[in-house]
Structures are given as C-alpha cells and as structure tokens.
Design a protein with these regions (language model features):
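Intrinsically disordered, low-complexity regions enriched in small/polar residues
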Residues: 12-15, 32, 41, 45, ...
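Non-heme Fe(II)/2-oxoglutarate
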Residues: 1-72, 78, 89
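Catalytic core of non-heme Fe(II) oxygenases with the double-stranded beta-helix
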Residues: 76, 83-150, 155-158, 165-177
Length: 177
C-alpha cells in the first residue's frame, strides 16, 4: 500500500511486518541486554542501536521501502527502544528543527515507530496516545509534535528516522514544543 502523508501528520501501516514469536523474543532480549538510558524524565527509557548486520534491519528496511515512504528519504539511526515499567512520558517535542521543516521543502523528514509488542504507543499533540498493535508501523512527519508515552508495563519497539538531504538532523537533539 503506497500513500502520501499529510503535512505535519502521521500514518499507520497496519501489520507492516508479521513478526514470529521467535523474532519478538530475540528483539526483546537484545533490547533488554544492550540498551542504555536516554532522554527521559527518569532512567526507565533505554535504547540500543540496530545496525545493518542485525537480523531484523533488512527485514524492516525492505518492508518500509515497499510502502513508498522512503522515496527521497534515507533510513538513519535505527534503534530498539525499551521502556521499563514505570517509564514516564517525555515532554512534547520535535525530532527535527521546526524552523527548517516547512511546507516550502520538497520532502519532509519523518520519524518511524514500529511495534514489536501490542499496546505500543506514542503521544501526538492534539490526538493523545496513539496505540499500535504488534507489527504496526507509525510514520510521522518531522513537524509532528509528539512525546514518548509513559508505560506501566515493559515495552520494546523500534524507532528510526527518515532523513532528507535538505535538513541536517542533530543527533540526540530535540526541540521542545
């Protein structure tokens, strides 16, 4: 299914990848074993990089390419995110400089969230918590204001960026709303 994303919005691709129980087990185990704490009000949100030699990288990359959203965009900085039970919600933010992500650019950069487990979620300003089931993929434009959700249970999910040549994303930086 190929589609375009509206400005500043998001699109959910239902069951982008059909995960096997073994794939889920390996991804969750890898995330829990290798993750380090990241930007969050507590130390319960962690991440670990997924490079192109990891078994899941090509599976996910191929599925994402088939949607058409990667056209004119470059997949970068793929990570597994691991939220421990009790993880607090992040502050609302942009992943890209909002002064650079405008309607005047040819193609906007995007963020991507892929659910390895049911009840994966992301807070989107004006929408609240947007839930994903296992295998669902949420693609959101760089000017979509969002926040990592609070979790009262452990959750592992994949996150990556779809960068564009016109806008340089600062690694590990956010712009608060």
């Amino acid at each position: 299914m190929k589609s375009k994303i509206k400005n500043g919005e998001y699109k959910i691709f239902k069951t982008l990848v059909q995960l096997t129980p073994q794939m889920c087990k390996e991804l969750k185990s890898y995330a829990k074993k290798h993750s380090e704490s990241i930007f969050n009000p507590d130390y319960n949100r962690l991440q670990t990089p997924i490079n192109n030699t990891h078994f899941f990288y090509t599976i996910f990359e191929d599925a994402l390419i088939k949607t058409g959203v990667t056209r004119g965009r470059i997949i970068n900085d793929m990570v597994l995110l691991y939220s421990k039970k009790g993880c607090k919600k992040q502050a609302y933010h942009y992943d890209y400089d909002p002064d650079k992500v405008t309607n005047n650019i040819r193609r906007k950069p995007c963020g991507v969230l892929f659910a390895i487990e049911d009840n994966t979620k992301l807070n989107i300003l004006g929408e609240g918590e947007v839930y994903l089931n296992q295998g669902d993929c949420l693609v959101f434009e760089g000017d979509c204001v969002h926040a990592g959700s609070a979790y009262n249970y452990d959750n592992v999910r994949l996150h990556t960026y779809l960068d564009v040549i016109d806008i340089k994303r600062s690694e590990n930086s956010t712009w608060f709303y």
